[in-house]
């Protein structure tokens, strides 16, 4: 008797689960005896099955710009009422809910219409939650690979409008009615992506009529997602390096031509840019539908560098010109020696036209007395007796020859200095022009799109 008193409190724990399991076994056996999972769960054939659909987006796995495929991890919640699966909880030990395999009952054949790669229907058959009222809730997980028309025109500052179109495959709107549980998909458990941010999301229900059966509607629910790309990765790894290459290209014109390193720097920048483009080409969507912004900027940078090389060749050629090969036109002297230097910051520098007057070999008042060191009588001329001396005459002619030769060399040097001065003026002009083009070109490519995004 004492042992019975001790065991009595734990009897419910020993026999309770067995009783509950027996009730649930009896309930399942009763429900599925004669149950046909092929037949729609309605009392009359003309009655439609109302299915409430809810999409819960868990993760945006990837966006394939080339193949235009968006891979996402979702949970597709479906609720409907099965009139053949109802019971009185009091008859089965108070059981109000049971979980049964989804393969054992009728389910709406929802599929992803815009499936791009993978299974159209849900593959993972999880259990459903069945209530005593006949209400069924099924929330299977799925990996959807949906088609999305990717517009790469503004890449990497692009905004994509992708969608998932869900509907029954064999039932029309008279047999199965699908309704969204909300005007927005559920993002309560959404895991943020490192590349995309969800700007907006909506769900829409559509009635579609086909030519074969104009009186029969076919229903679908389309979920739209507005995805904004996070461009930081491309700004740091692509755009900023291209800007630095453009800046180095402008510095070519700051380098003195006499250093002989202008072409070396230009070619080095071009080779570096080429190698850089080969490395990052895989980061850019390889599609011919449109040229993306980043592609336009890379093309601009390449043209910018090549143009600097061509112009550098012209500047170096100008720097090394001589009067024996090129005679400076009057308009070149007027523009690049007399006019532009007065308008720019190096206008105080001495120009060849000024230095020519200061570097005369002989002053204007030079006479023969400078040779002998003694004053020559005013009456002495080239035909006077003192100049008839062969030695004196020979000395005078030698001095005149030397003076003429040095004067010719001086004029030649002055002409060469003028060409060098013109090349220096060109360098200063091109330095300002290329730096301005670098800034304006960068703003011209990206500013418009950035302003549009800031207004969203």
Swiss-Prot record:
GO cellular component, one term: acetylcholine-gated channel complex
Disulfide bond annotation, renumbered to this chain: 148-162, 212-213
GO biological process: acetylcholine receptor signaling pathway; chondrocyte intercalation involved in growth plate cartilage morphogenesis; membrane depolarization; membrane repolarization; monoatomic ion transmembrane transport; motor neuron axon guidance; neuromuscular synaptic transmission; receptor clustering
Gene Ontology terms for molecular function: acetylcholine-gated monoatomic cation-selective channel activity; monoatomic cation channel activity; transmembrane signaling receptor activity
Topological category with respect to the lipid bilayer: Multi-pass membrane protein
Keywords: Cell membrane, Disulfide bond, Glycoprotein, Ion channel, Ion transport, Ligand-gated ion channel, Membrane, Postsynaptic cell membrane, Receptor, Signal, Synapse, Transmembrane, Transmembrane helix, Transport
Main location per the UniProt record: membrane
Pfam families: Neur_chan_LBD, Neur_chan_memb
Cytoplasmic compartment residues: 317-428
PROSITE patterns: NEUROTR_ION_CHANNEL
Glycosylation-annotated residues: 161
Cellular localisation: Postsynaptic cell membrane; Cell membrane
Segments on the Extracellular side according to the record's topology features: 21-230
SUPFAM superfamilies: Neurotransmitter-gated ion-channel transmembrane pore, Nicotinic receptor ligand binding domain-like
InterPro entries named among the record's database cross-references: Neur_chan_lig-bd, Neur_chan_lig-bd_sf, Neur_channel, Neuro-gated_channel_TM_sf, Neuro_actylchol_rec, Neurotrans-gated_channel_TM, Neurotransmitter_ion_chnl_CS, Nicotinic_acetylcholine_rcpt
CDD domains reported for this sequence: LGIC_ECD_nAChR_A1, LGIC_TM_nAChR
Catalytic activity line of the entry: K(+)(in) = K(+)(out); Na(+)(in) = Na(+)(out)
NCBIfam families (UniProt xref): LIC
Complexes and interactors: One of the alpha chains that assemble within the acetylcholine receptor, a pentamer of two alpha chains, a beta, a delta, and a gamma or epsilon chains.
Family, per entry: Belongs to the ligand-gated ion channel (TC 1.A.9) family. Acetylcholine receptor (TC 1.A.9.1) subfamily. Alpha-1/CHRNA1 sub-subfamily.
Function text: Upon acetylcholine binding, the AChR responds by an extensive change in conformation that affects all subunits and leads to opening of an ion-conducting channel across the plasma membrane.
Descriptive protein name: Acetylcholine receptor subunit alpha
Organism: Danio rerio
Gene name for this UniProt entry: chrna1
């Amino acid at each position: 008797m004492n042992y019975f008193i001790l065991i009595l409190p734990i009897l419910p724990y020993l026999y309770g689960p067995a009783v509950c399991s027996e009730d649930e076994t009896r309930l399942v056996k009763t429900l599925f005896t004669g149950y046909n999972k092929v037949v729609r769960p309605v009392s009359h054939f003309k009655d439609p099955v109302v299915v409430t659909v809810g999409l819960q987006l868990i993760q945006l796995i990837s966006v394939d710009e080339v193949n235009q495929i968006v891979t996402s991890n979702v949970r597709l919640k479906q609720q409907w009422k099965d009139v053949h699966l109802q019971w009185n909880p009091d008859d089965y030990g108070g059981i109000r809910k049971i979980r049964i395999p989804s393969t054992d009952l009728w389910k709406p054949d929802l599929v992803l219409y815009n499936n791009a790669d993978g299974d159209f229907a849900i593959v993972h058959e999880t259990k459903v939650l069945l209530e005593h009222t006949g209400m069924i809730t099924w929330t299977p997980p799925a990996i959807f690979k949906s088609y999305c028309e990717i517009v790469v025109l503004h890449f990497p500052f692009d905004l994509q409008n992708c969608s998932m179109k869900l509907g029954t495959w064999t039932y029309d709107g008279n047999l199965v009615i699908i309704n969204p549980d909300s005007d927005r998909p559920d993002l309560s458990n959404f895991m943020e992506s490192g590349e995309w941010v969800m700007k907006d999301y909506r769900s829409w229900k559509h009635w579609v009529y086909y030519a074969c059966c104009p009186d029969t509607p076919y229903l679908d629910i389309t979920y739209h997602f507005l995805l904004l790309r996070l461009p930081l990765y491309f700004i740091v790894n692509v755009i900023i390096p291209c800007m630095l290459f453009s800046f180095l290209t402008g510095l070519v014109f700051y380098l003195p031509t006499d250093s002989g390193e202008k072409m070396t720097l230009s070619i080095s920048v071009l080779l570096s840019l080429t190698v850089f483009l080969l490395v990052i080409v895989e980061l850019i969507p390889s599609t011919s539908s449109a040229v993306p912004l980043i592609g336009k900027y890379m093309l601009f940078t390449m043209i910018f560098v090549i143009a600097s090389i061509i112009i550098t060749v012209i500047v170096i050629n100008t720097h090394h010109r001589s009067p024996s090969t090129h005679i400076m036109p009057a308009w070149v002297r007027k523009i690049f020696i007399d006019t532009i230097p007065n308008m720019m910051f190096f206008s105080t520098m001495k120009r060849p036209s000024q230095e020519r007057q200061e570097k005369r070999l002989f002053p204007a008042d030079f006479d023969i007395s400078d040779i002998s060191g003694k004053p020559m009588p005013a009456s002495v001329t080239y035909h006077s007796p003192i100049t008839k001396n062969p030695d004196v005459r020979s000395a005078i002619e030698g001095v005149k020859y030397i003076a003429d030769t040095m004067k010719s060399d001086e004029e030649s040097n002055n002409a060469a200095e003028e060409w060098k001065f013109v090349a220096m003026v060109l360098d200063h002009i091109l330095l300002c022009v290329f730096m301005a083009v670098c800034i304006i070109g960068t703003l011209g490519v990206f500013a418009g799109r950035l302003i549009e995004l800031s207004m969203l």
